[in-house]
Amino acid sequence: MGEIIDGKKLAKEIQEKVTREVAELVKEGKKPGLAVVLVGDNQASRTYVRNKQKRTEEAGMKSVLIELPENVTEEKLLSVVEELNEDKTIHGILVQLPLPEHISEEKVIDTISYDKDVDGFHPVNVGNLFIGKDSFVPCTPAGIIELIKSTGTQIEGKRAVVIGRSNIVGKPVAQLLLIENATVTIAHSRTKDLPQVAKEADILVVATGLAKFVKKDYIKPGAVVIDVGMDRDENNKLCGDVDFDDVVEEAGFITPVPGGVGPMTITMLLANTLKAAKRIWKMN
């Protein structure tokens, strides 16, 4: 029976560490600030943003929310981002995705100052990650590495398979595993003999967006299984990309959904905001 990796507990520990560090900085008159820009009225995005705000405030940071209507022009959104780039009290900027169709996400991400790009999506940060230079790492991949390490697993020398090749999770998590000296395979919808490829993994990261896609025939006995999915099953119950009940017997360690990767994402956002603030203060 696999051991369950408690993402909530780990997220809480990291957040407490961030909060302590912020408290020390506040004593020196320095307060990290995070601005979130929300366009339109997508309920899922709104809930997620509210959660981010709450956690930012709990950590003792300044939290700013800028809400814009669904029909806002791209020009107006870009000018809001430019203003935040110039704002000395804001150290992290996050534009909540997805954006309405008439706005180019790429253009918006490119406009965020890479020093304040706490999501780690700016091309400069992506490039720095791939050449091994210090950068802001996307929050979910950063959280995944922390979850793997929390099991006591030595990543170096292990076979890791990442199923999914998105720019937000798949590619960056593969790069982070490579930096940790794992031997990495990226698998995707065109991969032949996928169960067989997955079964070679000591560490398996699944980010397919398909409910309960991975079954126990994908799992090497004792593997660390990280489920990035957030789906609904046929009964409308929250589940992941891994069929948890089927896989839990084979896995050595496994993240649950909910309560695995999810809680880590916001925590790593706070860690990135703290890092951004410290960097900006150091430069000035």
From Swiss-Prot:
<comment type="function">
    <text>Catalyzes the oxidation of 5,10-methylenetetrahydrofolate to 5,10-methenyltetrahydrofolate and then the hydrolysis of 5,10-methenyltetrahydrofolate to 10-formyltetrahydrofolate.</text>
</comment>
<dbReference type="GO" id="GO:0006164">
    <property type="term" value="P:purine nucleotide biosynthetic process"/>
</dbReference>
<dbReference type="GO" id="GO:0004488">
    <property type="term" value="F:methylenetetrahydrofolate dehydrogenase (NADP+) activity"/>
</dbReference>
<comment type="similarity">
    <text>Belongs to the tetrahydrofolate dehydrogenase/cyclohydrolase family.</text>
</comment>
<keyword id="KW-0560">Oxidoreductase</keyword>
<dbReference type="GO" id="GO:0009086">
    <property type="term" value="P:methionine biosynthetic process"/>
</dbReference>
<dbReference type="InterPro" id="IPR046346">
    <property type="entry name" value="Aminoacid_DH-like_N_sf"/>
</dbReference>
<dbReference type="GO" id="GO:0004477">
    <property type="term" value="F:methenyltetrahydrofolate cyclohydrolase activity"/>
</dbReference>
<keyword id="KW-0378">Hydrolase</keyword>
<dbReference type="InterPro" id="IPR020631">
    <property type="entry name" value="THF_DH/CycHdrlase_NAD-bd_dom"/>
</dbReference>
<keyword id="KW-0368">Histidine biosynthesis</keyword>
<dbReference type="InterPro" id="IPR020630">
    <property type="entry name" value="THF_DH/CycHdrlase_cat_dom"/>
</dbReference>
<keyword id="KW-0658">Purine biosynthesis</keyword>
<dbReference type="GO" id="GO:0000105">
    <property type="term" value="P:L-histidine biosynthetic process"/>
</dbReference>
<dbReference type="InterPro" id="IPR036291">
    <property type="entry name" value="NAD(P)-bd_dom_sf"/>
</dbReference>
<comment type="subunit">
    <text>Homodimer.</text>
</comment>
<dbReference type="GO" id="GO:0005829">
    <property type="term" value="C:cytosol"/>
</dbReference>
<dbReference type="InterPro" id="IPR000672">
    <property type="entry name" value="THF_DH/CycHdrlase"/>
</dbReference>
<dbReference type="Pfam" id="PF00763">
    <property type="entry name" value="THF_DHG_CYH"/>
</dbReference>
<protein>
    <recommendedName>
        <fullName>Bifunctional protein FolD</fullName>
        <ecNumber>1.5.1.5</ecNumber>
        <ecNumber>3.5.4.9</ecNumber>
    </recommendedName>
</protein>
<feature type="binding site">
    <location>
        <position position="189"/>
    </location>
    <ligand>
        <name>NADP(+)</name>
    </ligand>
</feature>
<comment type="pathway">
    <text>One-carbon metabolism; tetrahydrofolate interconversion.</text>
</comment>
<keyword id="KW-0554">One-carbon metabolism</keyword>
<dbReference type="GO" id="GO:0035999">
    <property type="term" value="P:tetrahydrofolate interconversion"/>
</dbReference>
<feature type="binding site">
    <location>
        <begin position="164"/>
        <end position="166"/>
    </location>
    <ligand>
        <name>NADP(+)</name>
    </ligand>
</feature>
<keyword id="KW-0521">NADP</keyword>
<dbReference type="InterPro" id="IPR020867">
    <property type="entry name" value="THF_DH/CycHdrlase_CS"/>
</dbReference>
<keyword id="KW-0486">Methionine biosynthesis</keyword>
<keyword id="KW-0511">Multifunctional enzyme</keyword>
<keyword id="KW-0028">Amino-acid biosynthesis</keyword>
<dbReference type="Pfam" id="PF02882">
    <property type="entry name" value="THF_DHG_CYH_C"/>
</dbReference>
